[in-house]
Amino acid sequence: GGGLGHVIAGVAAHKGFNVSVLTRHPEQWNPSLLIENCRGNTFSGSLACVTANPAEVIPHSDIVLLCLPGFAIEEELLHIQPFLQEKTCIGSVVSCTGFFFTAYRILGKTASLFGFQRAPFIARVQTYGQKALLLGYKKELQIATVNISKSDILLRTLQEMLDTPVRMLHHFLEASLTNSNPLLHPARLYSLFHTWSRGKAYHEIPGFYNSWDEESSELLIACDNEFQQILKALPVRIEPIPTLLEYYDSYDARSLTRKIRSI
């Protein structure tokens, strides 16, 4: 029911795919989603089904895509597990949540899994269950798969569904270990609140991105440097996981600050 869930459902339905939404609040959803994108276009996608009952949608789904934060993945996998078919590909909109590890533990090591390295879109909900904003596309998406024999078909399907080029990674760790939100969020929160002490009150909500400062960028770069050293000790390729400065087209803390403030 978050921004990515709304936008991906609307985009895929608009492209002609049969899309169902499994949500705890089906009564708040319209049968058709309205999507406004960053290119000035507005379009709609008609949903095949919106329900809170996994038995109504999971058994006949070829692809199940979880658009959930990490803490909610285990509960949802347990919720849908009795209705999953052997042919079903189960994926996560981002893999840094620990999706592959949790899915292995719950569904077993023969489950057909896939996961995105980074979220496909920058997305926000405007009106829950009715309209969402697609605020940014990615130039390219990267996914990892496990136990999917026809991964080329899945890749082509996702490319068509999301209207974005998709590239296959070599190992699920290349999708699971990312230097995006798992580094960005802690670095920013630490820089905002490390001076807190008992009795200290904040009189306004600090801007997460729009007031991003160089202290946050310096800490983020330091975290990424350590992260890159960890990657070198693991059986993964470094090329699919660029440094944060490379990813954000920046060269130091000052330029990174300008870039992140513009998000």
Model-assigned labels for residue ranges:
Residues 33-52, 114:
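N-terminal glycine-rich dinucleotide-binding loop that anchors FAD/FMN and/or NAD(P) in oxidoreductases
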Residues 1-42:
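NAD(P)+-binding Rossmann beta1-loop-alpha1 motif at the extreme N-terminus of oxidoreductases
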Residues 46-60, 167:
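Short acidic low-complexity segments
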Residues 26, 126-223:
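Substrate/ligand-engaging "lid" and interaction regions
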Residues 216, 223-263:
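Small-residue-rich helix-loop
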Residues 66, 70-129:
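Rossmann-like NAD(P)(H) cofactor-binding subdomain of soluble oxidoreductases
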Residues 16, 47-48, 61, 87:
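Short, well-ordered alpha-helix to beta-strand connector turns
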